Amino acid sequence: MDAVRRLLIPVAAVLALVLLPTSAGASPASVSAAAVQGTRPLDRTVWLCRPGLVHNPCGQDAEGMPQSAGPELVTHYPSGGTRLLDATRFTAGASGRREPFTVTGKPPVDCFYAYPTVDLLPNPPLQTGGRPPVPRDVHHAVTLMQSARFAGLCRMFVPVYRQVPLPALLAGIVVGSGADLTTATMDIRDAWDDYWTHDNRDPETGERRGVVILGHSQGTAVAAALMRERVDEHPGVRRQLVVAALLGGNIEVPEGRDAGGGADPASTFQHIPACRRPGGAPMPTGCVVSYATYSLPRGSLPAVIGRTASPGHRVVCVNPAALLRGEAAGARVPLDLYLPTRRLIGGSALLPNGPLAVPLNGYQLPDLPTGFARHPDALTGECTHATDGTASADWLQVGGDLSHFPASAPAGLTGLHAMDFNVAQGDLVALAAAQTRAWLDRRRP
């Protein structure tokens, strides 16, 4: 619970400036606590995206191929409207060029994604018993923004879960009660069990499929809890893990080691290591990529995310661009930035950031006809470590053209938290593809 509070405090503090006021009858924290106490497991998983759904928002059929005619993947908002995942690519001295997003072969592995905190109110409003949450546009918008471009590699599994909403996170911090993720963790764990039981076996071969686990912010917290229970201590399940990209949260390891080793309660995982590739070693699989994104002045440390006061431990920072290139862990390398556009997330003239108006407060997204604006060399990133006598911190230090972000964001309390996936989205997808190839090669006789 302390780790969860360290993760969520700065996010809640910033959101306090933009959240709607709550009623005077009961604080969101007390409402949330009461709701958690009265909940039970869902009768069935609520899927935002699952291959083969009749109207799959992620646009995939049962095999992961586009449901629509043609190779471009067409996604669907729950309230209506379609979006492509294409990008306008910008390079120095050249005008933008459209890059379509196509799927031409059956995805060889699966992706299981836990989205970050986006609910402003409890979903469902009355969280008692097994009342199910409802898929909403905000869940789809953040899925498109963060994880949908993995669909060329993965069949996408995205459960809707009863997360702690933003006002309740804030109120929990204010009154000192913390965030109770019991129900959120239960829903994600049960969705995983549903997936593992009914969907993980390949329909053609009958063999278990490889899995990429994705999470961000609260999604990272619940995905990490799921992995501790269902993956870390189970060698047979660990063998199916291609990689876990758990961003915007603290994944902790002992100093000088990449996992806990079996008996270190302060480590997030005992057996699943951080992804490392020393000295041109083969591409690692079955490991974790994690970072929090900032652009801090020299001598500064992140406020909370990326920071730990646990003696003898550090927060994991793995730069996906450096790992992909086989560079040293602390190397400064270009990042492949994919900014979501107003069109992608359903923005309008009245509400430019659409259903993500609160999480993306202050961001001015590109107004383009494509889903993303790609700037492959606008940013650089390097994993950075520092201490201040009371804590140590590890984070992805971003440099280059920061004009794409609000001026106060890069060095603020949460840094570029809202864009953790996007600052290196091209690298994350390319890395997962390379790790998938390595994982498949190692399984061949």
Q: Could you tell me what each predicted segment is?
A:
Residues T117-V118, S217, N250:
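Residue-level signal for short, function-critical loop segments
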Residues L214-G219, A223:
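Gly/Ala-rich beta-loop-alpha elbow adjacent to hydrolase catalytic centers
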Residues T143, A223-V231:
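Short, well-ordered amphipathic alpha-helices
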Residues P165-A168, A221, I251-E255:
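Short, well-ordered, mixed-charge alpha-helical segments that flank or form enzyme active sites
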Residues F112, V212-G215, V243-L247:
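Extended hydrophobic secondary-structure segments that form protein cores and membrane-embedded regions
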Residues P51-V54, Q60-D61, Q67-E72, T104-P107, ...:
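Active-site catalytic motif of lipid deacylating hydrolases and related acyltransferases
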Residues T182-E207, R228-A411, G415-M419, Q425, ...:
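Surface cap/lid and interfacial helix-loop subdomains adjacent to catalytic sites
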Residues R5-I9, A13-A148:
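Flexible, membrane-associating and regulatory peripheral segments of lipid-active enzymes
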